[in-house]
């Protein structure tokens, strides 16, 4: 049955996105079988719950296609590891430390503005947010290390700081260190140069929580990886929390040593995906309130509907509008936003049409536009049709009746139902959300 599971994984890899497969399916291991039950093992409760909720029917279908319809699946949780990393010999330890990193008399390098209260949680980052909160509430508990990955400007750095700030709010004496991997490497180089490796070791290995941002930058740097490896081992053995972020899944970081890659996979791996329009609006609202900027609803939607998924860029647009409003004494309006941000945002509502969306979606699903306009209720047509209708409402100024007219004369209530159906699925179905995001980006590019 192990061969069946490996083949089922291979089949699932062909239909799921690379990121989804790596996050949810690849970590599932074969345990054994009894009668017609396939026993599988999830690395932790988080993964088990999410797979059971979103992917178990798909997994079961894949397995049954290779066996028979009577095969069942039992998804268990891996037992906690009792093995700990081997303590490196004194001759191997070459870590260094110039100044202490935390405690009442030293800087943690944390940004006090980045807290869980200021983090906007949506479907795209809910898992990573929950994982970060769990670590902050119980450091070195179930999820050690915690590895958070995702694209630029999606909130990884915010969550790292939020973990540190929360722990400090509970325990001011906690020794916490937030470093970028580049700063870690530069400090290592300086300590090697001035022969202060003992200080380097004492600094990082006495931490209660080590937070490293953008770990991918140490890939290919042999000495830095070696020092981080020993630091990781020392902290892990001392039951201290380690949290790192990256723009890629551990296995996808070129030049990263296998021993580090395997250690990152000991704990929990959580991804952050691009925010949807609703989450971007919520982010803008929170930022506007914090900066005392009066932001009309139509302007918030205009900014959120831009092609950028980078939260920092999104907030930068808001700050720019706020500055213009403050300096000119004028209220922010949609016309002002279009004028001030014309070099950044192309107003998609002026360029994208219902016909363009229909053609683009039909090509993506290998369908004909006529299929999307038809009344056929085949599942292979219903979902693409609903997605196309949702995108028409999202990316054009067309009203519900106008969209219905272009989809074969459908009633506006049918169009409203399709939009609401997709909106609901976006928060529940990772694959559908990825598909919608891919289509949206393609239409805006």
From Swiss-Prot:
Residues 83-106 are annotated as: Disordered. Residues 326-445 are annotated as: Domain IV, binds dsDNA. This is Chromosomal replication initiator protein DnaA. Oligomerizes as a right-handed, spiral filament on DNA at oriC. ATP binds at residues 153, 155-157. One of its GO terms (cellular component) is cytoplasm. Residues 1-71 are annotated as: Domain I, interacts with DnaA modulators. The keyword Transferase does not apply. GO terms for molecular function: ATP binding; ATP hydrolysis activity; DNA replication origin binding; lipid binding. Keywords: ATP-binding, Cytoplasm, DNA replication, DNA-binding, Lipid-binding, Nucleotide-binding. The keyword Nucleotide-binding applies. Plays an essential role in the initiation and regulation of chromosomal replication. ATP-DnaA binds to the origin of replication (oriC) to initiate formation of the DNA replication initiation complex once per cell cycle. Binds the DnaA box (a 9 base pair repeat at the origin) and separates the double-stranded (ds)DNA. Forms a right-handed helical filament on oriC DNA; dsDNA binds to the exterior of the filament while single-stranded (ss)DNA is stabiized in the filament's interior. Belongs to the DnaA family. It is found in: Cytoplasm. Residues 71-108 are annotated as: Domain II. GO terms for biological process: DNA replication; DNA replication initiation; regulation of DNA replication. Domain I is involved in oligomerization and binding regulators, domain II is flexibile and of varying length in different bacteria, domain III forms the AAA+ region, while domain IV binds dsDNA. Pfam families: Bac_DnaA, Bac_DnaA_C, DnaA_N. InterPro entries: AAA+_ATPase (IPR003593), Chromosome_initiator_DnaA (IPR001957), Chromosome_initiator_DnaA-like (IPR020591), Chromosome_initiator_DnaA_CS (IPR018312), DnaA_C (IPR013159), DnaA_dom (IPR013317), DnaA_N_dom (IPR024633), DnaA_N_sf (IPR038454). Residues 109-325 are annotated as: Domain III, AAA+ region.
């Amino acid at each position: 049955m192990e061969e069946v599971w490996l083949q089922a994984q291979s089949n699932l890899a062909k239909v799921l996105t690379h990121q989804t497969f790596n996050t949810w399916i690849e970590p599932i291991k074969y345990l054994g079988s009894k009668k017609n039950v396939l026993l599988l093992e999830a690395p932790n409760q988080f993964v088990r719950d999410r797979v059971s909720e979103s992917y178990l029917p798909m997994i079961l279908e894949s397995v049954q296609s290779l066996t028979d319809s009577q095969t069942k699946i039992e998804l268990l949780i891996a037992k906690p590891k009792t093995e700990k990393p081997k303590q490196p010999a004194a001759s191997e330890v070459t870590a260094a430390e110039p100044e202490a990193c935390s405690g009442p008399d030293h800087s943690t390098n944390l940004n006090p503005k980045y807290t869980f209260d200021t983090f906007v949680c949506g479907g795209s980052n809910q898992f990573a947010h929950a994982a970060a909160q769990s670590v902050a509430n119980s450091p070195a508990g179930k999820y050690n290390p915690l590895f958070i990955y995702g694209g630029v400007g999606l909130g990884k750095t915010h969550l790292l700081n939020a973990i540190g700030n929360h722990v400090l709010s509970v325990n001011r004496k906690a020794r916490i260190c937030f470093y970028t991997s580049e700063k870690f490497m530069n400090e290592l180089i300086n300590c090697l140069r001035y022969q202060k490796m003992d200080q380097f070791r004492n600094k990082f290995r006495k931490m209660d929580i080590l937070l490293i941002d953008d770990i991918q930058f140490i890939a290919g740097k042999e000495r830095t990886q070696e020092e981080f490896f020993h630091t990781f081992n020392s902290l892990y053995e001392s039951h201290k929390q380690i949290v790192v972020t990256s723009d890629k899944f551990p296995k996808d970081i070129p030049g990263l040593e296998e021993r580090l890659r395997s250690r990152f996979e000991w704990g929990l791996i959580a991804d952050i995906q691009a925010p949807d329009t609703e989450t971007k609006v919520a982010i803008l609202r929170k930022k506007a309130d914090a900066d005392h900027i009066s932001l009309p609803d139509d302007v918030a939607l205009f900014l959120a509907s831009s092609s950028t998924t980078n939260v920092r860029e999104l907030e930068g647009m808001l700050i720019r509008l706020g500055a213009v409003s403050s300096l000119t004494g004028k209220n922010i309006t949609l016309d002002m936003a279009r004028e001030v941000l014309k070099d950044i945002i192309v107003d998609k509502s002026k360029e994208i049409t219902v016909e363009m969306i229909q053609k683009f979606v039909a090509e993506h699903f290998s369908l004909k536009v006529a299929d999307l306009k038809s009344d056929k209720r085949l599942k292979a047509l219903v979902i693409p049709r609903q997605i196309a209708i949702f995108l028409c409402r999202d990316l054009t100024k067309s009203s519900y009746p106008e969209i219905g007219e272009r989809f074969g004369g459908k009633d506006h209530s049918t169009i409203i139902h399709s939009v609401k159906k997709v909106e609901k699925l976006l928060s529940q179905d990772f694959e559908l959300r990825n598909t919608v995001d891919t289509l949206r980006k393609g239409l805006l590019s």
